[in-house]
Design a protein with these regions (language model features):
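Domain-level marker for long, solvent-exposed, non-transmembrane regions
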Residues: 1-134
Length: 134
C-alpha cells in the first residue's frame, strides 16, 4: 500500500491536549506497524537461510529498541479523520486517524536500524543492506 494508517483515541480536560496526545499515540501506532513489517522482513530472510539466528537476533533487538526513535522520525503525517465529543464530565474525547507514506516509513526504520547496528560496531548492517535491498 502507498500509505499506512495509524489511529488513536485520547481523553483530556480540553480539546487541544486530548488531540495532541491522540496524535502522538497514533504516531506510536504507526511506528509499531513499521516495526512489525521490518521484523517480518528479517524473519523471512532468516527463513531463507540468508541470515544466521544470531544475526537476526541482533537486528530484531535493534528494531524492538527503535520504536520510539521511529515514532520521533515520522515526519509530516496526513490527517485522515478527526472526531471529538464532550463527555458527561466535560472532558473531551478525541479520535484521530493519520496516514503516512509507506516508503518514507520504511526509509526511517532502515536508517534507525542501520545507525543502531553501526553504533554497536556490528558489521551486520552491510549484510542486511545487501540481503534486504536497502
Amino acid at each position: 500500500p502507498k500509505y499506512i494508517m495509524g489511529e488513536a483515541m485520547s481523553i483530556g480536560e480540553n480539546y487541544d491536549a486530548a488531540k495532541m496526545q491522540a496524535l502522538e499515540l497514533a504516531k506510536q501506532n504507526l511506528a509499531g506497524q513499521i516495526q512489525t513489517e521490518v521484523t517480518a522482513l528479517v524473519e523471512n530472510t532468516v527463513a531463507n537461510k540468508q541470515l544466521s539466528q544470531e544475526q537476526a537476533a541482533s537486528v530484531t533487538q535493534s528494531i524492538m529498541a527503535s520504536k520510539n526513535l521511529i515514532s520521533q522520525s515520522i515526519g509530516r503525517t496526513i490527517p485522515v479523520m478527526e472526531v471529538y465529543r464532550t463527555l458527561f464530565n466535560k472532558n473531551k474525547e478525541v479520535l484521530v486517524r493519520i496516514a503516512y507514506n509507506s516508503n518514507m516509513a520504511k526509509e526511517a526504520a532502515k536508517k534507525i536500524v542501520r545507525e543502531d547496528l553501526e553504533k554497536k560496531g556490528d558489521k551486520l548492517h552491510k549484510d542486511l543492506d545487501k540481503l534486504l535491498g536497502w
